[in-house]
Amino acid sequence: MKNNKENSLLVEKYRPTELENYVGNEQIKDKISTYLNQNDIQNFIFYGPAGCGKTTLAKIIIGKLDCDYLYLNASDERGIETIRDKVQGFASVASFKPLKVVILDEADFLTIQAQASLRNIIETFSRTTRFIMTCNFVERIIDPLQSRCQVLKIVPPSKKDVARHLAWILNQESISFEINDLVPLVNQYYPDLRKCLNTIQLSTVDGGANDLYLRLDQSILVSSNYIDKVIKALSNKTKFNDIRQIIADSNSDDFDELFRALYDRATEYLPGKEGTVAILINEHQYKANFRIDKEINISSLISQIINNK
């Protein structure tokens, strides 16, 4: 995408840096604002679906505090060595700032041993260091950690608010668009605003003379009915390779909606074995967080469902 304005990733360019520009979660914003006025915060766990603003909120907080901070992505650094070496090392070093903050992004990837070690560090350095953890699945955070934090659910803004925000960004970038262009985009990726913005970035065309317009390539959007096709194929005892092809053709890298549909509609394709389906989905949904190729993981689930027919 070319633009006569600052050329950067839209998702970063329009990441809010002020609480008042953060969309939604008004009660949480009021609570955090009170803490920031005192230049201190509690330990927090922010949880919610991908792309709903958990990390953005954490970064707004550290941007407003007079603090030193350490940022770690726990999906990359998830072991006890990271907690002992980097987190404890940071917390134990003297600082000229009145406060230190550790952000552990995607903390639900931390091993149980790492979480247990973190619990002790939170207690040991409670006078000087605060911790902000973000996660998609709060149930994967051990209870002793949750009890030492304020656990706050970050609720995504409504589809209408997401569409309104995207329209505002497009206008700011002087990108011509039709409001109907945003409907399939929001329906496809909601509540993940990050994916919406990345798709807009890929779909913005330079018409010459700085005339920018949005042209959504339908191949970028996952077919809205591929989930129905998978369910129908399972019901009709379609061969595994044919179902695998349906999934491959969807171009999806996020199968949360398919997991949910397989659970909700188990009676349609495996009547009498809904409990077995629930167990299989639970196992593969958990494994999806640790697999590089999620298509292989979902295909494995489909194979096991077929084998239970």
List where the protein language model places each region.
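Conserved GTPase G-domain signal focused on the G5
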Residues: 79-81, 191-194
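Helix-rich C-terminal "collar"/helical-bundle subdomain used as an assembly and partner-interaction module
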Residues: 229-309
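Alpha-helix N-cap/N′ positions at the starts of helices
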Residues: 14, 177-180, 221-229, 238
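P-loop/Walker A NTP-binding region and its immediately flanking N-terminal helices
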Residues: 1-155, 160-161, 171, 184, ...
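Short, structured loop/turn "capping" segments at alpha-beta junctions
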Residues: 175-179, 193-197, 207-214, 240-242
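Short conserved motifs of the RecA-like P-loop NTPase core
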Residues: 165, 176-188, 212-213, 225-226
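Loop-to-helix "switch" segment enriched in basic
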Residues: 208-235
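C-terminal helical "lid" of AAA+/P-loop NTPase domains
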Residues: 102, 183-188, 194-206, 231-232, ...
